[in-house]
Design a protein with these regions (language model features):
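Juxtamembrane/start-of-transmembrane alpha-helix segments at the extracytoplasmic/lumenal side
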Residues: 222-243
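Extracytoplasmic/lumenal ectodomains and periplasmic regions of secretory and membrane proteins
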Residues: 160-218
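Juxtamembrane interface at the cytosolic side of transmembrane helices
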Residues: 246-260
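Short active-site neighborhood of thiol/selenol oxidoreductases, capturing the structured segment around
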Residues: 56-86, 103-104
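N-terminal signal peptide c-region/cleavage motif recognized by signal peptidases
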Residues: 20-23
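N-terminal "domain-start" segment that seeds a small globular fold
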Residues: 26-58, 84-88
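Bacterial N-terminal signal peptides that target proteins for export
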Residues: 1-12
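Structural microenvironment flanking redox-active thiols in thiol-disulfide oxidoreductases
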Residues: 83-147
């Protein structure tokens, strides 16, 4: 049986936790986050929210530590899963919005509309009825110039593949201080509540986190063939290799102990 996209995504999410960016030399490396702890995001860059208001980014942060999720609302792959994992971690960690955090979701596609952002927000609220979301969750769209300024500030790299008709981009969250400084990153998907809570605590305190080595890319899964594109296939191969190496190490240790 050909594995479905949901199963495949879960496999990739699990493998991503064990794969470092060092293994990604090659054409896909330029899609990793360039982690820029200490950088200041463009608080004057203007974005449009689900109510159709166009405001500076700083107006949406409103003096709280912020979690930035960058993707696009019509993404057929992992963008919605990233938000789902984040919201689950926030709920499980007992974190409240807007007191503990502000969630800012930004589309990298300048063609997407406020109506698309509104639908994505409604979908997320349907699965996570979060008190305070009316004040603490901001799903935004923007013009290309504003998107580019924000992406550059946080080290987010993406490119559009006309053959796939999809954006190729990294998966992960950016944590920002109330003043708009990049505090740290939690990359991949499958976020643990403790990691999210710790990242928010650092951001609230104005601290910088260490760089995260994990890389996961969001793009094409071919449901017809059950195959992933090049980058994700590499993840699967690397995961298999790591499993073999781990088993070999355990067997070697067992043999060494018996030999003693």
């Amino acid at each position: 049986m050909t594995p479905g996209p949901t199963i495949g995504r879960a496999m990739v999410a699990a493998l991503a936790l064990a794969v470092s960016t060092a293994a990604w030399a090659g054409p896909m490396q330029d899609l990793a986050f360039t982690q820029r702890q200490g950088a200041i995001v463009p608080l004057d860059a203007r974005f449009t929210d689900t109510a159709g208001r166009t405001l500076p980014l700083g107006a949406f942060m409103d003096g709280h530590p912020a979690i930035l999720s960058i993707g696009y609302y019509t993404c057929p792959n992992l963008c919605a899963l990233e938000r789902e994992d984040l919201l689950h971690a926030l709920d499980a960690g007992g974190l409240k919005t807007p007191d503990d955090y502000t969630l800012i979701v930004v589309s990298i596609d300048p063609a997407e509309t406020a109506a698309m952002a509104r639908q994505a927000r409604q979908d997320d609220l349907a699965s996570h009825a979060t008190p305070g979301a009316d004040r603490g969750w901001h799903f935004l769209v923007g013009q290309a110039a504003s998107i580019a300024r924000l992406s550059q500030a946080v080290g987010f790299h993406a490119r559009y593949d006309p053959a796939l008709k999809q954006y190729l981009h990294p998966m992960g969250l950016v944590f920002m201080t109330p003043a708009g400084m990049v505090s740290g990153y939690v990359l991949g998907v499958g976020y643990r509540p403790g990691d999210v809570r710790q990242a928010l605590a650092r951001a609230a305190a104005g601290q910088r986190a260490e760089a995260s080595p994990v890389l996961l890319l969001c793009f094409h899964y071919d449901a017809a063939t059950g195959r992933y594109t090049l980058a994700v296939r590499k993840l699967l191969r690397l995961g298999a290799l790591m499993t073999v190496l781990t088993l070999a190490t355990l067997l070697g240790m067992a043999h060494w102990r018996r030999a003693r």
